[in-house]
């Protein structure tokens, strides 16, 4: 039996941040928890799936293996049973607020770094070909002066308020849950000689320069995840991730819609009448387009596979060129005389013979007038 996608189980995208995954899990776990659905086998199965998905996607190492190899990369790592490792609602609150056991203590002492976001503006050409960009971001990194301890002497004293747990147990109505210790801010220890460089935080803000590979075909709003390039974790915990959001600059010629490109192509009055070849710019060079005689404004020519590459396959979009017939301007007296002779040569049956759109329009006007005055 084919296993369900963990991302689909939690109703999140594959680029979802840790915060988004946690929020989605909490909502679903509260909805399908067996304590809320006694005797409901389907809810119990759903809760097991949700718990299994969260255990994998909330762990950076397991999530990375899952993204690379699918279920095969994590099946041997995940042993699930019962209700996915949760007893009652208190266990769910422990997951998000910390617990009174050694497990909660470990979480309070080791905290994963925060995820960061960066907006990167690129050109349509860069999105077409793909590009490597260099960016500089501010992020929190471990303090070199105190090796991340926050202490000059690199020594720590157990917090007297929480006794090293990092959390203090609270009772609210029927629920008992843990809150971060306000004395030590969840670290489980206190510092008597704070480091002069980081003021006891163990972290300092630094500028980090990174190279980001932008794949060809990337679109507005796409996010690229750089694992481990977010803020530094505390006490040996993993770093957060960096999410680079792509913004594509407006182009002077082309408009993008999904994987297709669109443009308006001005042609001369004579070229529209007589036809001929014209050079059309594309993102990867000029191409020659054959304009058929008697081409009208609004006609669209499709250039196959001259659009953007699809990120989700090997398809490439098309370039659609809309014709705009330009009316001549700044005419000399001689040119105007020639045009008048040309107009006279068309004769009285000009509309019926030489202007099909004009004929249709006037016919519609006449029909409308008849109905209006009848």
Curated annotation (Swiss-Prot):
CXXCXGXG motif repeats: 143-150, 159-166, 181-188, 195-202
Gene Ontology MF: a single term: zinc ion binding
Subunit relationships: Homodimer.
Species of the source: Francisella tularensis subsp. tularensis (strain SCHU S4 / Schu 4)
Keyword match Zinc-finger: yes
Binding-site residues for Zn(2+) 1, renumbered to this chain: 143, 146, 195, 198
Protein name: Chaperone protein DnaJ
GO annotations of cellular component type: cytoplasm
Positions bound to Zn(2+) 2: 159, 162, 181, 184
GO biological process, one term: chaperone cofactor-dependent protein refolding
Pfam families to which the protein is assigned, alphabetical: DnaJ (PF00226), DnaJ_C (PF01556), DnaJ_CXXCXGXG (PF00684)
InterPro entries per UniProt: DnaJ (IPR012724), DnaJ_C (IPR002939), DnaJ_domain (IPR001623), DnaJ_domain_CS (IPR018253), HSP40/DnaJ_pept-bd (IPR008971), HSP_DnaJ_Cys-rich_dom (IPR001305), HSP_DnaJ_Cys-rich_dom_sf (IPR036410), J_dom_sf (IPR036869)
Stretches annotated zinc finger (CR-type): 130-207
Cofactor details (free text): Binds 2 Zn(2+) ions per monomer.
Gene name in the database record: dnaJ
């Amino acid at each position: 039996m084919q296993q369900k996608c963990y991302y689909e189980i939690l109703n999140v995208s594959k680029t979802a941040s840790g915060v988004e995954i946690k929020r989605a899990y909490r909502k679903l776990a509260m909805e399908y928890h067996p304590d809320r659905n006694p005797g409901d086998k389907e809810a119990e199965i759903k809760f097991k799936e949700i718990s299994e998905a969260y255990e994998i996607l909330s762990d950076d190492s397991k999530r990375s293996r899952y993204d690379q190899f699918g279920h095969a990369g994590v099946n041997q790592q995940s042993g699930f049973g019962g209700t996915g490792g949760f007893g009652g609602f208190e266990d769910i609150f422990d997951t998000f607020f910390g617990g009174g056991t050694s497990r909660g203590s470990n979480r309070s002492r080791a905290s994963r770094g925060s995820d960061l976001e960066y907006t990167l503006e690129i050109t349509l050409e860069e999105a077409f070909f793909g590009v490597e960009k260099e960016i500089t971001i501010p992020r929190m990194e471990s303090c070199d002066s105190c090796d991340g301890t926050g202490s000059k002497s690199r020594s720590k004293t157990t917090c007297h308020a929480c006794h090293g747990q990092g959390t203090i147990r609270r009772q609210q109505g029927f629920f008992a849950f843990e809150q971060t210790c306000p004395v030590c801010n969840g670290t489980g220890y206190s510092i008597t000689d704070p480091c002069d460089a980081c003021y006891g935080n163990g972290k300092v803000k630094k500028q980090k320069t990174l190279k980001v590979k932008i794949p060809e075909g990337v679109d507005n709003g796409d996010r690229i995840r750089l694992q481990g390039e977010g803020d530094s974790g505390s006490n040996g915990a993993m770093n957060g991730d960096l999410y680079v959001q792509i913004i594509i600059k407006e182009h002077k010629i082309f408009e993008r819609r999904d994987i297709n490109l669109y443009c308006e192509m001005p042609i001369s009055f004579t070229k529209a009448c007589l036809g001929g070849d014209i050079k059309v710019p594309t993102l990867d060079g000029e191409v020659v387009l054959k304009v058929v005689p008697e081409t009208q404004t609004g006609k669209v020519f499709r250039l196959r596979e001259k659009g953007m590459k699809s990120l989700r396959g090997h398809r490439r979009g098309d370039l659609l060129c809309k014709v705009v017939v330009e009316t001549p301007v700044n005419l000399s007296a001689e040119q105007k005389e020639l045009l008048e002779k040309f107009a006279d040569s068309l004769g009285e049956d000009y509309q019926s013979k030489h202007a099909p759109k004009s004929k249709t329009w006037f016919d519609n006007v006449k029909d409308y007038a008849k109905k209006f005055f009848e």
